[in-house]
């Protein structure tokens, strides 16, 4: 009991000292949420940081809910644009726009040499995973409902937990094993394999989830050797460049039919009229990532993390309103199981972390998020500035 009280007093004291650094650190922390933008996984690296007072929890919940809402609108815009434009120019221009914001931030927040990296192999590998995975993710949009695509993609946090156990030898108890099995059953139900209505295109967001989870393993190696901002910038810029040869190769190897018009290597439909929409896409993503970072900065992760799963029902509602999409029963049932599984695993992660090292925070799995978790010294600026 005395140890618990001491930790609580230490966390409050540390939080007060760090309060004046919150806004300066916000751009760095915002890059942790890039852009998976969930769509995706919340259960990866856990790191020590002071926990905010409980009185600020409502603000944190409001921030994370608004951030997830913006992510949903971002994906809905992408789905709408893919009806008229090929995917490759959209991904490239969006990456360029995000880079125009991120690179100046890197130069502003630190010395210019910090943008240089010796970890080219890791960055290129992560960029390949992102370019490949999220190209497949968005390629599924014209064929599936927004709810179905996002539900299957939310297998990413489950896969990340499995990969961490297999490749990083992290311990996992019976509670989380049971929750993982429950969640994967939900993914299978959402995909509905073996049924007459099964669509092979539903495998695309699952492959993206696997790519994303694999990139999380690399993120843990990068996260202790480079800042989150530099690592996130490399991932986004390189992935934006990789989609060009990736799209060209896809069109050379495969015969793209009429149904795959959005996958064709064509720039004819791309005009400057679409540029404001791409700027809006980039702005939505940046604001959403900032809001998620702010939420984890001012509130207890245990209070706000489960609200990231609000993305799934919001995507279902917006898909119905914007595209007249009525999700199938298996999508809704699988979605509910994934949400229950993910929230329970997050709860167990937090409980275990608090028992061993005290208050924690964790990485977000919003769609498109590069998943780079900052070091403890990056989150706590006193180690650099004092």
PLM region descriptions:
Residues 150-155, 222-238, 286-320:
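Helix-helix packing/entry segments at the starts of transmembrane helices
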Residues 197-260, 264, 268, 357-386:
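Transmembrane alpha-helical segments that form core, pore/gating elements
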Residues 81, 90, 140, 146, ...:
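Hydrophobic/aromatic residues within transmembrane alpha-helices
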Residues 89-92, 96, 141-168, 301-318:
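Specific alpha-helical transmembrane segments that line the substrate/conduction pathway
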Residues 44, 59-63, 84-132, 211-215, ...:
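Transmembrane alpha-helices of multi-pass small-molecule transport proteins
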Residues 59-65, 112-136, 200-206, 257-287:
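Loop-to-transmembrane-helix transition segments
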Residues 44-46, 313-386:
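C-terminal-most transmembrane helix of multi-pass membrane proteins
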């Amino acid at each position: 009991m005395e140890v618990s009280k001491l930790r609580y007093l230490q966390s409050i004291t540390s939080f007060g000292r760090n309060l004046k650094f919150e806004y300066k650190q916000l751009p760095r922390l915002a890059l942790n949420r890039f852009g998976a933008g969930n769509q995706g996984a919340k259960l990866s690296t856990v790191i020590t940081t002071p926990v905010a007072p409980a009185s600020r929890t409502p603000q944190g919940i409001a921030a994370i809910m608004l951030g997830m809402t913006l992510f949903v609108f971002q994906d809905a815009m992408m789905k709408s644009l893919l009806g008229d434009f090929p995917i490759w120019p959209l991904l490239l221009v969006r990456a360029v726009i995000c880079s125009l914001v991120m690179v100046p931030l890197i130069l502003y927040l630190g010395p210019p040499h910090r943008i240089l990296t010796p970890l080219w192999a890791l960055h290129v590998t992560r960029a390949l995973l992102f370019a490949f995975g999220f190209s497949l993710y968005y390629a599924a949009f014209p064929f599936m409902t927004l709810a179905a695509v996002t539900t299957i993609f939310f297998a990413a946090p489950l896969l990340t937990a499995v990969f961490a156990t297999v490749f990083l030898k992290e311990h996992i108890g019976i509670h989380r094993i049971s929750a993982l099995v429950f969640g994967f059953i939900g993914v299978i139900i959402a995909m509905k394999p073996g049924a007459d209505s099964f669509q092979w295109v539903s495998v695309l967001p699952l492959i993206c989830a696997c790519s994303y989870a694999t990139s999380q393993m690399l993120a843990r190696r990068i996260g202790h050797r480079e800042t989150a901002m530099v690592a996130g910038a490399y991932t986004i810029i390189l992935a934006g460049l990789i989609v060009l040869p990736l799209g060209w190769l896809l069109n050379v190897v495969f015969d793209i039919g009429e149904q795959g018009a959005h996958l064709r290597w064509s720039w004819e439909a791309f005009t400057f009229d679409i540029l404001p929409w791409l700027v809006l896409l980039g702005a939505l993503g940046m604001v959403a990532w900032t809001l998620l970072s702010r939420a984890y900065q001012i509130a207890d992760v245990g209070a706000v993390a489960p609200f990231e799963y609000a993305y799934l029902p919001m995507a279902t509602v917006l898909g119905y309103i914007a595209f007249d999409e009525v999700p199938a029963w298996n999508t809704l049932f699988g979605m509910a199981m994934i949400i229950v599984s993910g929230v329970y695993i997050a709860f167990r992660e937090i409980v275990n972390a608090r028992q061993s090292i005290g208050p924690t925070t964790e990485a977000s799995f919003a769609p498109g998020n590069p998943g780079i978790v900052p070091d403890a010294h990056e989150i706590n600026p006193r180690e650099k500035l004092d």
